[in-house]
């Protein structure tokens, strides 16, 4: 059997190694357009920033090492320009020599990945405008940074690559401005959770120009102007385009393969395309979203590697299936970690799913052990079935651990209530006896059993301020003085029982605290004294960050034990 693989990064490299492990006698040819294979795509921004010191650290394998270990014929700097499914051949152009030749195959695997989305804008040919996809792109940017020593940079786009590049450039002393049309960074997050990311970027000097449209670029001496639709141009020493990626599927289209959303390649669970003996994996393929069941594009290394393994199994006569992706991701931004899995509120609404959510601010580990850090956690679940839909966490230490637990729970099709039963490891340096994931389950359990009601930050302005409701802030006096919601009366939680006779049981009570814990306790107390009570999800901290994009959580102490 002869197998030809087009593309040698995540999906392609994973597949060829698996094919060899399954079939020692197969003839395997891997053709890669760039000069590198099996490189750490996700590490490219960190090489630009000097965090990864040596170029060799980016390449997990080389053509020589693949041959020595797996006897795989790797051909770099060669581009497949056409596929002939009827004759089972591909046309190959050797970029260095100019030679064009035909290669036969029994099985063909397409792993072309995705290419940076590059709009048709003027000035794209400027030597100071860059995109980042390949090792060659990375080397070009790093050379520019080392030689030209830019002081300012504009990043068009606020996705993973754009934000990682922003962090690395800032750490190198470059003043960075991010411009993008959407009004929030990191699309997998809801706008409220993205506010924490906005605050972190601004805290490190990154200027955010959100909701603005780039119309072109113009070279002006040793700088480049980024032209904006409704604002004055931005002058900088360099520009990096990071506005997203598009499936690189022109070969598949010309060969007559069925295409799906945004031109992606349609595959079944076996990673087979619409043409016999042609498989496809990675960022170029359309997948089924594990949560919604709808078709989606999910450009992540994890799914690409799994798909490569599955395609290899089936090429070698197996029967492996890819059951979809839920888009689990994590991102480091300065001292912050942002992570998500499953779907967010926007996606749930688009899918027509009736959902609810809880917001909490747990600590990364037991607060009496030094170094505990806070995180904002948001968990979505389906109202009727209580099926877990998604989660988003932003914070310091421990974010990655909790998002992976929640991703596993979603994959296992657990209900939100089953989070309470998870038996997770505990020691003071690592967690609390009730892990944050357990706590999310407890909160949902109380909501669904009617023990507590909640209202959300975007409903605060609609609260009755005409005296027909009691608005109560149960934080300490010091916290209240530093900032509070308009119209809310301060009665600290520990004093609440002494003031019950001052409250009207005929009026609904809306309670606020710093992070949602004390307001929950207040509602449990008030409910048992005959009041109808709701508490603010996420508390004043969440409201402040979302509405003003600056953190005020430092003004609170755990459970209100403030040192006055």
Question: What function would you assign to each model-found segment?
Answer:
Residues 1, 8, 284-397, 428-432, ...:
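Mid-to-C-terminal Rossmann-like scaffold of FAD/NAD(P)H-dependent oxidoreductases
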Residues 25-27, 69, 75-96, 103, ...:
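A Rossmann-like FAD-binding core segment of flavoenzymes
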Residues 59, 152-153, 160-218, 298-304, ...:
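Rossmann-like dinucleotide-binding cores of NAD(P)H-dependent redox enzymes
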Residues 417-428, 432-469, 477-510, 514-564:
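Rhodanese-like catalytic fold shared by cysteine-dependent sulfurtransferases
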